[in-house]
Amino acid sequence: MEGESTLGVLSGFVLGALTFHHLNTDSDTEGFLLGEMKGEAKNSITDSQMDNVKVVYTIDIQKYIPCYRLFSFYNSLGEVNEHALKKVLSNVRKTVVGWYKFRRHSDQIMTFREQLLHRNLQTHLSSPELVFLLLTPSITTESCSTHCLEHALYKPQRGLFHRVPLVVTNLGMSDQLGYKTEPASCTSTVFSRAVRTHSSQFFNEDGSLKEVHKINEMYAAVQEELKSICQKVEQSEREVEKLLMDVNQLKEVRRTQQARATGAGEKNVQRNPQENILLCQALRTFFPESEVLHSCVISLKNRHISPSGCNVNHHVDVVDQLTLMVEYVYSPEASPVPTAQLRKRKALDTHDQGSVKRPRLLETESRPSVAASRSRHQDKASSSSLDIDIEMGSPEDDADYPRSPTF
């Protein structure tokens, strides 16, 4: 994997002990490697201010367990004997980081049996990062006075076994002069006994903290409550959405009703024209006792409809604003009249050429009294509508009542 690397670290005295044990035997030897594996992320900043993070996994080999004969925990096919493996690794199963083998007078290449055995050990020990240390001593001189020891650390990657760099530490290396920040894998017996004595108060049987277990229970309870609240919130949001849709529909209906009412009001205003206040006040002033002239609606039979009468006082008292009193001048072009009335007026002019019409105001002053005039007007108004039209068109009434543009 890019950005990751593996490094093996083997102390000098462990390598010396392995070599001493192998040289004191007459055959090949094998065993297990104990230690720990740790990862470290190294961040290096370049001149371009770009971070380069690299993860380095270090396999620290600290101990070894030898097997005093070959095929002690496996057979010739590379199959692992579980019972024999438990017997060899009784209490140190979790600290196993790999296994090793000494082969005399051979090449630095893993055999097919060793590859099968390594994969089976990965399965039984549940350790995919398991490594294999191969040591191959050989004699370089004929007198057997000089020996050569080659060693290599192998690790499977993507189905193939690759060599892993192995560093043998000693007192002459500058890297080992500093303080170690990681604790050693070997712990004190007294400390372990004290921890086992009081561990029941803080740890469960599986090694987990009791407080952590309680916190996990509280977290699960909070999650359940949160789920129930989320369901209620979702339901309320759906109800609010439905109510908003209903409100929008009601607003649309209200807007339509207001538009219809506004259109109907405009039609009513057009159908009912504005009342002529001056005419109404004039009729109430000059004909106060004639309810027929005060009514806005009259039937075909000249019957007064009482609800249609105008009983409102418009407070218009100026006489000049009620009617325009000017001297009547007859003009056929301005006011055409029927042929029968025109003939009557011509006969009247021939009969009495010396008579002259007087203004209405002078005739009103020459009358004996206002009460007599009102009674005579009331008698004339009580006749039928057809008689009123004929009398208004007669020469006698024209002589008595000169015409006014207002009426």
Curated annotation (Swiss-Prot):
MPN domain location: 7-155
A biological-process GO annotation: mitotic G2/M transition checkpoint
Keywords from the named record: Chromatin regulator, Coiled coil, DNA damage, DNA repair, Nucleus, Phosphoprotein
Coiled coil: 209-259
Record localization: Nucleus
GO MF annotations, alphabetized: polyubiquitin modification-dependent protein binding
Sequence motif pSXXF motif, location on chain: 404-407
Biased composition regions of type Basic and acidic residues, renumbered to the chain: 347-366
CDD domains from the UniProt entry: Abraxas_1
GO cellular component: BRCA1-A complex; nuclear body; nucleus
Segments of skewed composition (Acidic residues): 388-399
Modified residues (Phosphoserine): S48, S384, S385, S394, S404
Residue ranges, annotated region (Disordered): 344-407
Domain of life: Eukaryota
PTM annotation: Phosphorylation of Ser-404 of the pSXXF motif by ATM or ATR constitutes a specific recognition motif for the BRCT domain of BRCA1.
Cited Pfam families: MPN_2A_DUB_like
Function: Involved in DNA damage response and double-strand break (DSB) repair. Component of the BRCA1-A complex, acting as a central scaffold protein that assembles the various components of the complex and mediates the recruitment of BRCA1. The BRCA1-A complex specifically recognizes 'Lys-63'-linked ubiquitinated histones H2A and H2AX at DNA lesion sites, leading to target the BRCA1-BARD1 heterodimer to sites of DNA damage at DSBs. This complex also possesses deubiquitinase activity that specifically removes 'Lys-63'-linked ubiquitin on histones H2A and H2AX.
Family: Belongs to the FAM175 family. Abraxas subfamily.
Subunit structure and binding partners: Component of the ARISC complex, at least composed of UIMC1/RAP80, ABRAXAS1, BRCC3/BRCC36, BABAM2 and BABAM1/NBA1. Component of the BRCA1-A complex, at least composed of the BRCA1, BARD1, UIMC1/RAP80, ABRAXAS1, BRCC3/BRCC36, BABAM2 and BABAM1/NBA1. In the complex, interacts directly with UIMC1/RAP80, BRCC3/BRCC36 and BABAM2. Homodimer. Interacts directly (when phosphorylated at Ser-404) with BRCA1. The phosphorylated homodimer can interact directly with two BRCA1 chains, giving rise to a heterotetramer. Binds polyubiquitin.
Protein name: BRCA1-A complex subunit Abraxas 1
Gene name per UniProt: Abraxas1
